[in-house]
Amino acid sequence: MAAAAAAAAICGEDETAARVGCTGEWAGGIERVDLGERKEAVAAAGAGKRSVYLMDCAPVWGCASTRGRSAEMEDASAAVPRFADVPVRLLASRRDLDALGLDADALRLPAHLFGVFDGHGGAEVANYCRERIHVVLSEELKRLGKNLGEMGEVDMKEHWDDVFTKCFQRVDDEVSGRVTRVVNGGGEVRSEPVTAENVGSTAVVALVCSSHVVVANCGDSRIVLCRGKEPVALSIDHKPDRKDERARIEAQGGKVIQWNGYRVSGILAMSRSIGDRYLKPFVIPKPEVMVVPRAKDDDCLILASDGLWDVVSNEEACKVARRQILLWHKNNGAASPLSDEGEGSTDPAAQAAADYLMRLALKKGSEDNITVIVVDLKPRKKLKNIS
């Protein structure tokens, strides 16, 4: 599988990067197969149309990142095409898959990962997340996949919660030095922490496949789906003054203090993160997860650190990204170039959108690092058949 060889596309200080998989139009016209659309999907399959679950699409994207007005660059990002194969039973019910004539136990969908990690106190944890989250997530998906055959009907949301929670907790344990390993003679040695106890990072991650987008968020980076002309927030910022977050912190004996904004113990301006072991158990690495079926009018995803979101609204970001992508294709043609391998090339349309958003945040006075990933979800070439 190409995921084994794929490395994360990294945006460092004042650099931009973009890589491409494949694009496509939904063959046969089935944009998504959801529980509420079972009859239509079955009818389409009977008419000779191909299910979205038999499509392989690596989305195209662009990434832009800058230190901005900050003294240090503490953001990191990752784009990893085909990092894992997802059991289709995590995306649809056995009943629906059987109705489509698909093997519910054997079928896997190629998945692609995008992530933004906004560090604080240093870049070490953000950089560690960039290198490790997709690896650990792939391992957790394989672990779950081995057990799916023994399960009955699967609660998709429950299993995705479990997969991402274990992934983020494992990375947090590694960062904090809470991992033990067996040495010669059978003894155990605890690993060293990656960095100081006051260093941490947000993590917002999107897993994209042909049928769904699955999002996990921990912290105050954000992901927004541009669906048609409307922004759809796929994450909710973890701020200490959020009612449920404040209640959780105070139930653990912690305090939320107003000190140049609401902060945990008067220090950290977010209520969840990876790292920050000096603020445990008040600051936790548990992500909130959302599973979203893809739709025909999905335009793009925007993942970004708060250097963008502090000065640009969801509505403006979607409007700008959509306009820049359309403008590029209007001036240069409908299709973006593809590499011979189907991944690893640049996508100038998505890159133009990411660059523009980064410059817009600077123009609006953002004082933080800014990292933006724009994932173009609009199909422009035929999808590859994986059946």
UniProtKB/Swiss-Prot annotation:
GO MF, one example: metal ion binding
Catalytic reaction equation(s): O-phospho-L-seryl-[protein] + H2O = L-seryl-[protein] + phosphate; O-phospho-L-threonyl-[protein] + H2O = L-threonyl-[protein] + phosphate
Entry keyword set: Abscisic acid signaling pathway, Hydrolase, Magnesium, Manganese, Metal-binding, Protein phosphatase
Its biological purpose: Protein phosphatase involved in abscisic acid (ABA) signaling. Together with PYL3 and SAPK10, may form an ABA signaling module involved in stress response.
Required co-factors: Mg(2+); Mn(2+)
Binding site for Mn(2+) 1: 118-119
UniProt superkingdom: Eukaryota
Substitution effect: residue 267 to M: Decreases binding affinity to PYL3 15-fold
Cofactor binding note of this UniProt entry: Binds 2 magnesium or manganese ions per subunit.
Effect of residue 265 to K: Abolishes interaction with PYR/PYL/RCAR abscisic acid intracellular receptors
Family statement drawn from the similarity comment of this UniProt entry: Belongs to the PP2C family.
Binding partners and assembly: Interacts with PYL3, PYL5, PYL9 and PYL10. Binding to PYL3, PYL5, PYL9 and PYL10 is dependent on the presence of abscisic acid (ABA). Interacts with SAPK10.
Protein name, UniProt field: Protein phosphatase 2C 50
Source organism: Oryza sativa subsp. japonica (Rice)
One GO process term, biological-process aspect: abscisic acid-activated signaling pathway
EC number: 3.1.3.16
InterPro entries associated with the record: PP2C (IPR015655), PP2C_BS (IPR000222), PPM-type-like_dom_sf (IPR036457), PPM-type_phosphatase-like_dom (IPR001932)
EC top class, as a word: hydrolase
